[in-house]
UniProtKB/Swiss-Prot annotation:
One of its GO terms (biological process) is tRNA modification. This is tRNA dimethylallyltransferase. The record marks T101, R127 as: Interaction with substrate tRNA. InterPro entries: Dimethylallyltransferase, IPT, P-loop_NTPase. Keywords: ATP-binding, Magnesium, Nucleotide-binding, Transferase, tRNA processing. The gene is miaA. It is an enzyme of class 2 (transferase). Belongs to the IPP transferase family. It catalyses: adenosine(37) in tRNA + dimethylallyl diphosphate = N(6)-dimethylallyladenosine(37) in tRNA + diphosphate. GO terms for molecular function: ATP binding; tRNA dimethylallyltransferase activity.
Amino acid sequence: MKTKIIVIVGPTAVGKTALAIEVAKRFNGEVVSGDSQQVYRGLDIGTAKASPEEQAAVPHHLIDVREITESYSAFDFVSEAKMTIEDIHSRGKLAIIAGGTGLYIQSLLEGYHLGGETPHEEILAYRASLEPYSDXELAHLVEQAGLEIPQFNRRRAMRALEIAHFGQDLENQEILYEPLIICLDDERSQLYERINHRVDLMFEAGLLDEAKWLFDHSPNVQAAKGIGYKELFPYFRGEQTFEEARESLKQATRRFAKRQLTWFRNRMQVTFYQIGESGVQDRILSQIEEFLDD
């Protein structure tokens, strides 16, 4: 029997953390971060980690598990998330995956091949090469490969092509979980306003000092490439004014949010909820309760 888990995704600044904490309190759960940047110690403000008070109220996992000089990949996330979920489930609690790194979360849910003779990065690279194709083009590739997919959808097509390309058996792609995937969204103008406001709050909380520390110590590491830091480096080099750098960060974050939504819409089977609608949290909690009771 597959383990039931709750997955909360959506663009940055939409309220994933707050909802995950509420779900954890309501259903005796623990939160597993699905964010590629929150793994780094010392990068707290720019990655929008749950506050110490929030982490004290509900157990959080896969936060602060790497030094800024260390790398982190989808392989690392899947391996560590699987162990974490197993531990949470063994204690009779509900695992709640919350984050905005679509590749990591999709890798976990779809059981990406993490061993065997084919290097994991080759598989991810092949999948990435399929992403630009439209549904019709993918269907044509599937037909050319002589594959049959009942109830065609994009996810099945990409997976079938991957298996055909690398010669892997379907059984090797182990699906361990039965997820309920909730995607939070907002009206575009409202979301962008939330993003701009959050960036302002980050600066008030000390983002500039955090980014300067990273710039001074490890400007070329993977951790420094995340949105929230690299946009400020031109200011530290004297190439931009502070206001220009702040606006650059807001713009980059808005673009990132758009890419996140595109990923969740096209790559994952999600249930969308508009956070601005009346009673939306109650509807989400009701859906989760029905899912867990089923």
